[in-house]
UniProtKB/Swiss-Prot annotation:
<dbReference type="InterPro" id="IPR029569">
    <property type="entry name" value="CALHM"/>
</dbReference>
<feature type="transmembrane region" description="Helical; Name=S1">
    <location>
        <begin position="22"/>
        <end position="37"/>
    </location>
</feature>
<feature type="topological domain" description="Cytoplasmic">
    <location>
        <begin position="1"/>
        <end position="21"/>
    </location>
</feature>
<feature type="topological domain" description="Extracellular">
    <location>
        <begin position="38"/>
        <end position="46"/>
    </location>
</feature>
<keyword id="KW-0406">Ion transport</keyword>
<dbReference type="GO" id="GO:0001772">
    <property type="term" value="C:immunological synapse"/>
</dbReference>
<feature type="disulfide bond">
    <location>
        <begin position="41"/>
        <end position="125"/>
    </location>
</feature>
<keyword id="KW-1133">Transmembrane helix</keyword>
<dbReference type="GO" id="GO:1904669">
    <property type="term" value="P:ATP export"/>
</dbReference>
<feature type="topological domain" description="Extracellular">
    <location>
        <begin position="127"/>
        <end position="167"/>
    </location>
</feature>
<dbReference type="GO" id="GO:0022832">
    <property type="term" value="F:voltage-gated channel activity"/>
</dbReference>
<keyword id="KW-0813">Transport</keyword>
<keyword id="KW-0391">Immunity</keyword>
<feature type="disulfide bond">
    <location>
        <begin position="138"/>
        <end position="145"/>
    </location>
</feature>
<keyword id="KW-0395">Inflammatory response</keyword>
<comment type="function">
    <text>Pore-forming subunit of an ATP-permeable channel. In response to pathogen-derived and proinflammatory stimuli, relocates from intracellular compartments to NK-dendritic cell and NK-macrophage immune synapses where it mediates ATP efflux and NK cell activation involved in antimicrobial and antitumor responses. May assemble to form gap junction channel-like structures with gating and ion conductance likely regulated by membrane lipids and voltage rather than by extracellular calcium levels.</text>
</comment>
<dbReference type="GO" id="GO:0006954">
    <property type="term" value="P:inflammatory response"/>
</dbReference>
Amino acid sequence: MEKFKAVLDLQRKHRNALGYSLVTLLTAGGEKIFSSVVFQCPCTATWNLPYGLVFLLVPALALFLLGYALSARTWRLLTGCCSRSARFSSGLRSAFVCAQLSMTAAFAPLTWVAVALLEGSFYQCAVSGSARLAPYLCKGRDPNCNATLPQAPCNKQKVEMQEILSQLKAQSQVFGWILIAAVIILLLLVKSVTRCFSPVSYLQLKFWEIYWEKEKQILQNQAAENATQLAEENVRCFFECSKPKECNTPSSKDWQEISALYTFNPKNQFYSMLHKYVSREEMSGSVRSVEGDAVIPALGFVDDMSMTNTHEL
């Protein structure tokens, strides 16, 4: 049991690194399956370029959209935004949150493109069908090279085609490593700038993360317990044809208040929207944004809180 707790603690401490590692492994594995099982270059001047680009970019686009769909912040931002009764966040704040979501969602597609470029098959197929690059690839080669170039991915036995494919694979791998280096540098820069502009110290940020984990866990347990009690009372009253007991549950407005995007204010340092809500008496009964509220990138994890719809009873 102690070992299991140690594993859980390790997972909590390094959840971001473990998450990115898992995404990288799954993306690399998916690309390997696509390139070896599904991908078959048509080897025609008409289809090589679009076929190669589709396999290189469309899965990346799908992973990008999936990254949005799997983010709790996305649904926190979108849920109820078209309702007349919903309170709209400022356009600048929403745009800033969308930019953060885009950067997070872009990790998997960039991984796909980088792995695909290192493997080289998609790039070889696409470039061999490009009429603009044909003169460059066929420079100093057989006069019929331009016409036979689209067939290069299917004629790997020919020496001339092997040379062209080797050249294309080398180019693809160079671009792949450049992309990987650029992504790593960008991640380090963003992380450094985010921490540099953090309004709280390193230790307070760690305390904040501990609080966030505990609040998320307790909210999940308490919500499941209250939902179970309410369901049991309603079912009991249905079968007994009796009136239900009074059950105090948060109103729709209450849920909207704690579901809003978190904003930081140095005058009132609340650790979550739930914390801000229960302290609302100090703020004239409202948790709406006030002057000084700001979206802080280093505190973006606060908006990742969500409740699952399954619970062991």
